[in-house]
Amino acid sequence: MRSLVTYRGRSLGIVVLTVLQFLVGVVHVFFGLWLLAAGSQPIFVVSGQSPEVYSVYTLAFGLLVLIFTSGIWLSKRWGWGGTVAVSVFVVVADALTLLSLPSIPGIPRFAAAPEIIYSLSMLLYLSQTHVRIKYKIST
């Protein structure tokens, strides 16, 4: 199945996915660094639970998203696999947070539901047959 709209040989879906993932990665890297820098200031503590853990988690998540997004853009199988793995992790971690079960300390409950919806959308798109074929994932 060929997309009618392409950019540099990539379907519109891949272009949208990489732009969105790039923005998600940049925002998380920025906030991860900001939270690490501001963590020593009591006024900036996001959660009473170990703010350093959430800061490092946010930074690491952002960096992984950026790395795997570059793989998606370059049509690399590891980009697809990494994006799927990170998306599944986010769904699980945020679902645990919403259920008040042990998860990453400091994940804001207000952000969990939108992150789950976004991650499930990414997983739905990446699981489509034409995308799996592009990244040489067995169907």
Describe the residue ranges of each PLM region.
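Topology signature of small-to-medium multi-pass alpha-helical membrane proteins
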Residues: 1-139
